[in-house]
Amino acid sequence: MQQYEKLFSEGQIGTVQLKNRVVMSPMVLGTGGLDGTPGEQMMQYYEERAKGGVGLIITEATRVDEKHGPLAPRQLAMSKDRHIEPFAKMVKRIHRHGAKVFCQLHHPGRQNLSLLVGTWRLSEAIGRHWHGYWDIFFKVAQHADMVEKTGLLPPVVAPSPVPCRLQKQKTRALKTAEIKELVREFGAAAKRVQLAGADGVELHGAHGYLIQEFLSPYTNRRTDEYGGSFDNRMRFITEIIAEIRRQCGADFPIIARISVDEFYREIGDPADEGITLDEGIRIAKRLEECGIDAIDVSSATYETMNYWLEPTSFQTGWRSYLAKTVKQNVSIPVLAANLIRSPEQAEQQLKEGIQDFISLGRPLLADPDWANKAKAGRPEEIRRCICCLWCFESMLDGAVRNRPGQCAVNPRTCREVGIPKEPKKDGDGRIVAIVGAGVSGVKGVVERRENAMKEEYQKFIAPVI
C-alpha cells in the first residue's frame, strides 16, 4: 500500500489531469536568459524537478510587458512572439517526464526598481547585439539606489501613487489606457504560453505585485472604474481573465494566486488595513464566479514579507488556516505552500481537507527528488530545507551581479549544468584533509569517497546544522 496515498493520487485543474498532488511553486532565481528566454541552465533546473516526480511545475514569475514589467534581468518573459519557441523546448523537456507545465504571468507594479523601468527596453536591445554591454549594466545595477537618487529615471507604476515602503521608489498611477493595454498584454502572453504547448497559466495576484495592488484598498485609491468599490478593484483581474478566455478559449486552465491576507496589522498598521482574510475570501469567491479553475493561496506583500517568505522561526504549517478557510468557501481546487516540511505533513493536510494540492517551493530547491523519495517510501532520504532564506538573499544579490540564486543545502541548485548529479568518485585512495566535520564536510567525504582526514575542534561530527 502506498504510504502517502492521497499525496500521490491523481488530481485535476480545469481540463488538465495531474499524476499526483505535488506542485512546484513558482520562484524567480535568475536562471533565465537576458533576452527573457530559458537557456540550458533553466531547462535543466526545471527538468530535474520533473524527473524528481512532481505532478505540476508552475514556472517562475514571467513578465508580460517590457515597458515597466521587468522584475529582474534574468527573468522569463512571454511578452514577444520570439519567446514562444524557446519556451516550447522547455515545455517538451518537462512533459517528457510526465509533469504538466503552467506559466505564471506577472507584472511587479510598484514593487520594482526605476532602473529597470527606465533602461530595460534599451538595455535588452543593445545587449542582444553587444554582449559586452551587460558588464556595464550590472556594474551600474549594483548602485541602483544612487542612480535612483539622481531623479533622472522614470517612476515605477501602480494603481495609485503609493510607494512601497521597502523599495522606496518614485511611484505614479497608471493611466486608464495603460491599464487596458496591460489587460491585452496579459491575454497575449497567455496565448503565447498556449502556443508553446504549456498546459495552463497562473496569474500572480499575490505578494504585493500589480494585480494584488489593484485588489487591495491600501494600494488602490483610484476614483475611476478601476478603484473604490470592491467590484471596481476586482475589475483589472476579471478583465484579464476574460481576455485570456477570449484569446485561449474556455478549456485553457487559469489559476489565480492571491494573498488572502496582507498582514499589515502585524507591522503596526490599522487592523483593517489592506486585504484581511474576510476580504480575501470575497476575492476568492468572486474569482470562482469569473470561471477560474483553481486558487493558489498565499499571503503578504514586500512590506510584510516575513508572512510570505517564512524564515526559520515560523512554525510548520502556521498559515494552513488561510487555505482551509478559502477551501471552505469555494468549490474549485485550492493549492497552497503552507511551510510544508515533510511528506507526512503534506499527506495529513490533504486528508484534513485543508487544500487539494501541495505547493512546494524551497523544499524542491533543497531536494529535486522530494516526490520520488516520498513515493518510494524513503522520506528519511529527503534533503530537508532549513528555511534559512539563503535562496532569497542570493537571488537578490545575484540579480545585480548577473548570477543565479543558490541553496544552502544543495550546491547543484541553479547550477545543474556545471555540477553533475553523480560526481565522479575520484578519490582513488588519496588522503584528503577536510577542515571541519560539519554537514558539508561529511557530505563531501561520503560523495567523493576519499580517504579523508577530518579536522574538527569539537569531539563529534556535524556539530552545527
Model-found features: residue ranges?
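Flavin-dependent oxidoreductase catalytic cores
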Residues: M1-I465
